[in-house]
Amino acid sequence: MFESKINPLWQSFILAVQEEVKPALGCTEPISLALAAAAAAAELDGTVERIDAWVSPNLMKNGMGVTVPGTGMVGLPIAAALGVLGGDAKAGLEVLKDASAKAVADAKAMLAAGHVAVMLQEPCNDILFSRAKVYSGDSWACVTIVGDHTNIVRIETDKGVVFTQADNAQEEEKTSPLGVLSHTSLEEILAFVNAVPFDAIRFILDAARLNGALSQEGLRGSWGLHIGSTLAKQCDRGLLAKDLSTAILIRTSAASDARMGGATLPAMSNSGSGNQGITATVPVMVVAEHVGADDERLARALMLSHLSAIYIHHQLPRLSALCAATTAAMGAAAGMAWLIDGRYDTIAMAISSMIGDVSGMICDGASNSCAMKVSTSASAAWKAVLMALDDTAVTGNEGIVAHNVEQSIANLCSLACRSMQQTDKQIIEIMASKAH
């Protein structure tokens, strides 16, 4: 009904959000390996007795210290075992959503028996790479995921190759809805958000539903570092003000607490990350409630936040040494500024101030401490919005911030793409030394 009102660019924007904003149960790096393992197990008729897995250094970094939902355990081995014994290979990032208590117990027993090995893929030119090879008697199956958390590129068994993805990545990039982001701007994204029919973007309200539920769970339970619930107690003790800034901080932190602590609730992810999805969603929800926004205004603000976050992250490697909660929070700054002011200049100033503030925050792997970085990023976003509302921002005379927001974004992303590669290697070396 509304398709006739939507031009091709807007359709690409909607498809890009639908492609990058998806439900995900558990941190997406171990979940990627769980999916590879589940897909491999689906190729065998017998019971899987052993698992060998190989992952890229970046995937190892993000899988070493994070809790796998429903298991109470951290790390890639339990993710691989549970993927085999309780995973649904057709469920993508929700591969473990139906894993039973028996499957969890069996997975732990498989680990205890020493039947799961996870190794670094060396050499590895792919930032995101996971391969699982599973064995049942004399039979085996192997599944490889490359480039994206759910992008299966090869399925092979002892009987031969079952599936291989054609190597046409450059052509796909040209036709992919994400490809259009290389040739657009924040101004075009804002024009889309202001004018697109509500029914075409109503689906983004699911992000508020899922990530709002995670936030509530984080405040109820003692998940992860329980930053959200701890700060809520400090409000009750009079050590922290009960105001909008604090509500943004507490509710966003709580969602990440639950996410990283292993709550069995899905997050609505952004750019392959639950924490990025939380960061792009919850601050906007809190401000929307404060200003009394209806569903349509909330949907437009969330669409601006998520699409801006995708637009910025598309200029980054899929995984890098740069904490992408910071770039997701730039999207949140845009969404919050839009709810209060709506002007492009305010949005641009807020993002520029974010780049002048939290740039360079490192990603040292997925863990409970991600909630600290999520809370810092959300607070910085709101601070940047408050400054922008008074026409104050970090200017192009300072640091890596340029005189226009598009160049500021490009400057930030060039750091992650080039200069921070050695940083990433050093982080992985430090983390690997701790594991021994």
Curated annotation (Swiss-Prot):
InterPro entries: Ser_deHydtase-like_asu, UPF0597. One of its GO terms (biological process) is L-cysteine catabolic process to pyruvate. It holds the Pfam family SDH_alpha. One of its GO terms (molecular function) is L-cysteine desulfhydrase activity. HAMAP family: UPF0597. Belongs to the UPF0597 family. This is UPF0597 protein YhaM. It comes from Salmonella paratyphi C (strain RKS4594).
